[in-house]
Amino acid sequence: MFIFLLCATIAAAGCSSNVNSAGSKGNNDQAKSSVNGSSNASEQAHSIEAGTQELIVAGQEIAVTLDPVQPLTTAYLRNMGVAEALFKVNAAGEVIPELAESATAIDPTTWEIKLRSNALFWSGKAVDAEAVIASLERSRELDLQAQPFLEGMTFSAIKDDTLKVETEREHLPVPLNLSYYQTAIHNAEAKHDSVETMDMTGMYKVVQFVPKQKIVLSINENYWGEKPSIATVVHEEIADEQTRVMSILSGRSHIALNVNPSSLAQFEHNDKAAIIAAPAANTQTIYLNLNQSQLADVKVRQALSWGLDREELVVLGAEGQSVPITTWLSSNPAYAEAANAVYTKFDADKAGELLDEAGWLKDSDGLRYKDGNPLTLRLMTWGGDKALGEALQNQWNNLGIKAEVQHGDYSLIETARETGDWDATIEAWSTFGDEYALLSGQYAPEARGNFGGFNDEATNQLLAQLAGAADAEAKRKLALQINEHVAEQAPVISLFPRPQLTAISQSLHGFEVHFRQFENTITSRLTLDAQ
């Protein structure tokens, strides 16, 4: 069974100068889309008492650690209802308060944020201004992924329940920047190295953690907000795609995350589970290591992009569940006009000409050589990108490139990046949010997402202009200019928005469809049928 729901079009990086919980609640409720009926437990005649309910989520992977500043951790904790930020983005793309109660822009470079008076860490420690500042500063210091969203902000406590945020840039969308999972609020005084020492604020507490296997959660009885009705959540790591699919089709699990498009056919005539497809503002991207000699040449990088048939890649790598794009930012609906910029069509002839100009000439064996050495490219893939990697390998081979693909665990990619022994990898980062934070986080010389070492003077100058842009139209114009210029330089190759497919059991009710599904799976609205 299939359920395809479209979220409202997302406004780019927008938030009003006043954000408050009372004023946002009504719009938020109207914006939410739910699947399988009402999410109100009192209206579910078939619901059972919370004390006996257990929800099982099958994921491709679980959090690697319990420390929110470590890689591959906070997104999973927030997705499971463990971690919270000051703000969050609802399904309509609106920024609403979470641990904050309200936010007010005092002047172009100053915000005041009032905190919820009843919010506590699991330990019972108050979520006051000093604790929030300590958390954000710890994230700034230790989490490279958080730094673009905290850059240029200075925090100070006005009162126990109020903090001031001063910004270097005028009109910085502070609530939006503080809605990202990388800014999750945690007790900075805690060690976060075990179930016993971690200290978060979410509606679910971690009670068991077995790395690479499962995380078990129970209700936080002191939660400040609406408590969930399901007593226990188990997030299991099932790396194998088919095993994960069979887990939900058999009824063993209630949610299966990151379903590969190749598995869609198994749900067509199934009455046990449904596939939810939410539009995602992210871009399936090939990151190139510019420290490798063959990839240091911009003509080679441009050839790699011109020589890709993206329509075929969507079919082979995403089962047709996406659309081709040629620039990174264009997966954000607000920048969809740039979807076909620079690389306007698949052009193998142009790719060949560029490789010829770069000195890589075809030999009788069909491969391209320069100074007696073949043009090689090693692509590392992980997760559900195996078929995509093989399709890319075939298309590049047709250009005379000796392409190889290594598919494995993400840790292999991390290790290769640490040693520098890699040519290309695939990632899909979100393109929704403040344009400067997003683009600088990818293309500034020391940015966390700048895996390949891109350092381009023109890009750096444009980023500096974007940082100082005062009005929305100027920001938009500069963002489009940076987006197109980077595509021309080709340190990365944009392919298509990564399909965001989630399978949910027909016994689960109140599931919210969200364009940022990766951090909005578990909510207090979920209920289960009696068994």
Residue ranges, per PLM feature:
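Ligand/substrate-recognition segments at binding pockets and active sites
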Residues: 361-431
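Structural transition elements
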Residues: 324-363, 385
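N-terminal lobe/hinge region of extracytoplasmic solute-binding protein
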Residues: 58-107, 137, 199-200
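Surface-exposed binding/hinge segments that line
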Residues: 104-108, 147-189
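Ligand-site clamp/hinge motif
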Residues: 192, 220-266, 393, 401-404, ...
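Gly/Pro-rich hinge or "lid" segments in bacterial periplasmic/extracellular proteins
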Residues: 94, 170, 176-228, 232, ...
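Aromatic- and charge-enriched surface segment that lines or borders ligand/interaction sites
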Residues: 101-143, 294-296
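Detector for C-terminal structural segments
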Residues: 210, 307-337, 384-393, 414-531
